[in-house]
Amino acid sequence: MPELPEVETSRKGISPHLINKSVQNVVLRHTQLRWKIPQDLLSDIKDKILLSIDRRAKYLLFNFTSGTLLIHLGMSGSLRICPLNSPPKKHDHADLIFADCLLRYTDPRRFGAILWLGLTPEDSPLLNKLGPEPLNDDFNAKYLYQQATKRKLPVKQFIMDQKVVTGVGNIYATEALFNSGISPIRAAGNISEKRYQILVTEIKEILQQAIKQGGTTLKDFVGSDGKPGYFQQTLQVYGKTGQQCPSCETPLKAVKLAARASVYCPECQS
């Protein structure tokens, strides 16, 4: 699933091609994604200027003069800039057509979303309960420690809760916990503010490095230029159950938390 770095990579890749341009047409080949694409989407954005593209958590927000379009990449989605009249492939479900290029939405598993939020996107139930962005200053050790008070939830699930902090998915939570020396199964409320400071620093550093490297491509994700990300080459423990810990050579273990495998070192993480 594309996580925050992959979504931010997409945003940075497509923005220079589309900002301050107007949509000429919309082509919908398959409208049933996670939710059905609005049939009147064309009337909402045709001839409207795209002012900016923002990211909130794992959502992309296309801010037009007429309102905001939300795009979510789901489990396997991607956005690409293509020349006009580029022939679509099997999983290319939607195109936003501009004067000199088109934005193509591809989603093999069709678990993403294209939704019109109108002029008050902040009122959307998808956005109005999200926690702070992990790269912003309001996501800090004091905040995380306060949120964790008396919480018995494993810390891995805690930092993946979108109401606590947005956009920290399985890959980057696993890596940040390893770098912090914190076991994913330790209760969130049983971690000191000092250790949360280490964890917050690692989360920010890992996300920033992943963005610089174009995200992580494990299966489906490609950037707006069709190229994969390269952060997977620096992963230390994610997806490496049974391999040696890069620090102490102890075999890495995996535990299932909320239906997701979490790989960790039983010696280095406590």
Curated annotation (Swiss-Prot):
Cofactors (names): Zn(2+)
GO molecular function terms listed in the Swiss-Prot or TrEMBL record: 8-oxo-7,8-dihydroguanine DNA N-glycosylase activity; class I DNA-(apurinic or apyrimidinic site) endonuclease activity; damaged DNA binding; zinc ion binding
What quaternary arrangement does the UniProt entry report?
Answer: Monomer.
Keywords attached to this entry? DNA damage, DNA repair, DNA-binding, Glycosidase, Hydrolase, Lyase, Metal-binding, Multifunctional enzyme, Zinc, Zinc-finger
This entry's comment on the bound cofactor is: Binds 1 zinc ion per subunit.
Give the CDD domains listed for this entry. Answer: EcFpg-like_N
Q: List residues binding DNA.
A: H91, R109, R151
Q: Which organism is it from?
A: Psychromonas ingrahamii (strain DSM 17664 / CCUG 51855 / 37)
Biological role: Involved in base excision repair of DNA damaged by oxidation or by mutagenic agents. Acts as a DNA glycosylase that recognizes and removes damaged bases. Has a preference for oxidized purines, such as 7,8-dihydro-8-oxoguanine (8-oxoG). Has AP (apurinic/apyrimidinic) lyase activity and introduces nicks in the DNA strand. Cleaves the DNA backbone by beta-delta elimination to generate a single-strand break at the site of the removed base with both 3'- and 5'-phosphates.
**Which family does the record assign?**
Belongs to the FPG family.
The reaction(s) this protein catalyses: Hydrolysis of DNA containing ring-opened 7-methylguanine residues, releasing 2,6-diamino-4-hydroxy-5-(N-methyl)formamidopyrimidine; 2'-deoxyribonucleotide-(2'-deoxyribose 5'-phosphate)-2'-deoxyribonucleotide-DNA = a 3'-end 2'-deoxyribonucleotide-(2,3-dehydro-2,3-deoxyribose 5'-phosphate)-DNA + a 5'-end 5'-phospho-2'-deoxyribonucleoside-DNA + H(+)
Entry-linked PROSITE patterns: FPG_CAT, ZF_FPG_2
Q: What is this protein called?
A: Formamidopyrimidine-DNA glycosylase
Q: List the FPG-type zinc finger ranges.
A: 236-270
- Gene that specifies this protein: mutM
Q: Gene3D superfamilies in the record, alphabetically?
A: 1.10.8.50, MutM-like, N-terminal
Tell me yes or no: is Phosphoprotein among this UniProt entry's keywords.
no
Q: Where is the active site?
A: P2 (schiff-base intermediate with dna), E3 (proton donor), K58 (proton donor), R260 (proton donor)
Q: Name one GO biological process term.
A: base-excision repair
EC numbers on record: 3.2.2.23, 4.2.99.18
